[in-house]
Amino acid sequence: MKTVIALLIGAAVSARLHAQARGGEWTTTAGDAQRTAWVRADARLSREAVQEGQFRFLWKMKLDNQARQLESLTQPVLLSNIISYKGFKALAFIGGSADTVYSLDYDLARIFWTARLNTWPVKNSTVACPGALTTVTRATPLGQTGTAPGPGGGGRGANNNVYVIASDGEAHTLNPQTGDDLVQPVKFLPPNAKAMGAILIDPILYASTADNCGGASNGVWSVDLGHPAKTVSTWETKGGRVAGTAGPVFGTDGALYVATADGEYSDSTYSNAVVALDPKTLAVKNWFTPGRTPFTTSPIAFEHGGKHLIAAGNRDGRLYLLDSASFGGSDHKTPLDKPAPYASVLGDFNAGALATFADPDGTRWILAATGGPVHGDTKFPAANGQVINGAIVAYKVVEQNGGPVLQAAWVSRDMAGPVPPIVVNGVVFALASGEYRTTDSQMTAAQRAKQSKPAVLYALDAATGRELWNSGTTITSFVHAIAPSAGDGQVYVVTHDGVVYAFGIPLEH
C-alpha cells in the first residue's frame, strides 16, 4: 500500500511540475472567459525568442473533414497536460464542420483520437446557415489565460472533458482520453442552429446563436449540465443577431455580456446594443446602445483602475469603452469613450472579436482588426507602412480627466482580410486570412473560396506593431473567420481546406 501511495504522489508531483513548465492553457474561443485572446505567460514564446529566430513552422496535418459552406475547422482548444493511458500527453481539440471532433498530440504531431458524432444529414445548407459543428470548448475558469493548470487526470473527476455542440443541436461531453461520450448527449439547441462561442463555466454550458438558423432565435442559451433536469434557458435579442465570433463574454464583475447587430430598433428589442445579462437566469441587467449603428465584434472584458470595463467594435469604425457600473448612464447611450473612427470603409470592420492585454508596466492595450484603409481622422503615433487591404490597430487605455479613455498607439503593416489578433508574451500574432469578403448574398461558398488567397501569419511587436516574422508561403489555403490560438510555445492556424498548421519554438525532449 505504501508503494502505491508513493507512486500516486510521485505522479501527481510530476504532473504539477510538467504543467508549470508548460504554462497556461487556451480552453475556449478567444482563450478565456473574458475573450481577451491573451496568453499571459508562456515558458518559451517571447518577443526575444522571435527576434532571435527561434520561432518557426513546426508541422501541418490534413484532417478528413468535409467543409460545410465556408465552415471547416474550429479554433483549437488546448490541454497541455493529461496523464493518459499512453503517459503524459499534450492535446489540441478541434471540431470539424461535418460533426467530427479531433484530438491531436501536438508534441508528436499525431492524431490521438477521432470522434464521429451521430447526427442527421443536413438539409438546405446555406452560407449564412451551414448546418455545421462550429464550436468546441473545455471547462473554463472565470479568470484569464496564462497560469499553469493542475495535473490532468482525465475522465469525469478532473473535468478535462471536451464539450461540443453538434449540428443537430445536441451538447456532447467527450472523454478527453478517448473521445467517447461520457454521458447521454443533451438536447440544447434546435437542429442546424448556428452556435458561436460555446463556453462551460462548470457546470453551465453557454453559447450564442445567430442568423435565426434552424429556427433558433438570435440570443444566448444555457444549460446546467450538472442538474438532472438539464433545463435550457434562453435570452432572445428580439431583433438583431448576436454580433461577433467569440460568443458570450464574462465580465470581471461576474455578469454576462453580448453585443448585437442591426435589427428592429425599439424599446422592446435589443438591436445595436451591448447587453449585460445575469449568468444564472439570463435576465437583462443593463444595456448600452449608440443608436442605429450595429456592433460587429463580440465584447472583451477587463479590469482597469478598479473599474470593470467592457469594449466592443461597431460598424461605424469605432471602439466603444463602457464601465459596467454605469453602462451608458441613465439614457443607456453614454459610453466612457468612443474615439474617432479608425476604419475608413464603414462596415468593413467585421473581424468579429477584439484582443486585450496588459504589458509589464501595467499599461492596458486593446487590439482590433480593420478590413480596409485606416480612417484619416485617427492619427496613430506609430505606423508600419501604407494600409490598403486591412491592418491591426492598437489603443492604450489611459486616464484623462479622472476616467479611462482610449488613445491610439500604432497600426500594423498592410494585411489582406485580417482576423482577430492574439497576444502571447509581448508578441501579437496577426493572421491575414486571405478570404474574399463580400456583401453579395448570392455568391456561393465555392465562388468565394475560388477568389480567396492563402493566409499569412505575422508576429508583431506588441509595443510598436513592427513586424518581427511572417510565415511566407507556408500556408496554402485561406481562413474563414477563425483566429489563431496559442499556448505551450506554439501558435495554431486552421484553414478552409481542413489543414492544421503549428508554428512555434520546438520543445526539447
In which residue ranges do the predicted regions lie?
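Predominantly extracellular/luminal regions of secreted and cell-surface proteins
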Residues: A21-R47
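Sec/Tat signal peptide C-region and signal peptidase I cleavage site
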Residues: A15-A19
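Bacterial N-terminal signal peptides
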Residues: K2-A12
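Extracytoplasmic/lumenal domain signature
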Residues: R22, A43-L70, S80-A90, D99-A132, ...
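Mature, folded catalytic cores of secreted/periplasmic enzymes
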Residues: V13-S14, H480
